[in-house]
Amino acid sequence: IAQFERTLISGDSKFDKYLLGEISLTQEEENGFNVFMDEAKGDCFHCHGSNNNPLWTDNAFHNNGLDTTFQDLGFGAVTGDPNDNGKFKSPSIRNLAFTAPYMHDGRFATLEEVINHYSEGLQKSSTIDPLMKKVNEGGVHLSQKDKNDLKAFLLSLTDRKFINNPNFQE
């Protein structure tokens, strides 16, 4: 199985082609990338990586402000350490157009809901990740334009060729 999984390489998204200089991003996608990378705006890259990390995840466990108390202890259930309660592994955002519902428990059906959570829905708890710098303000408070542009960028990470590859069907 591991050998097969090593053949599953997604690297033909619009953003991948942009990095290779083959195409341009729309203004919305480009602004969305800037929102993603800007610590004063989206500040998404700490957990979900950047164009220097083709996996688009740090593969680490974080409490991203979903709850103030935890029915699901997350990583804390594995380690037994209460400091790990509410921490879940950051997923790759590559091909996220195909991975709804979102979050560890599927609580968000749409990308808009996910973006709204980080924008104005953060919940403070004793184990909140220090990377959630705006938790005391409830989130990063993106404008509607920045939210729309961030979504456009995130969707540019969709590799339809990979998803539709007949070698990986059934």
Predicted regions and their residues:
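Short glycine/threonine-rich turn/loop motifs
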Residues: 13-117, 122-129, 165-170
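Non-globular targeting/processing and membrane-anchoring segments
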Residues: 2-13
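Extracellular low-complexity, Gly/Ser/Thr-rich intrinsically disordered linkers
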Residues: 107-161
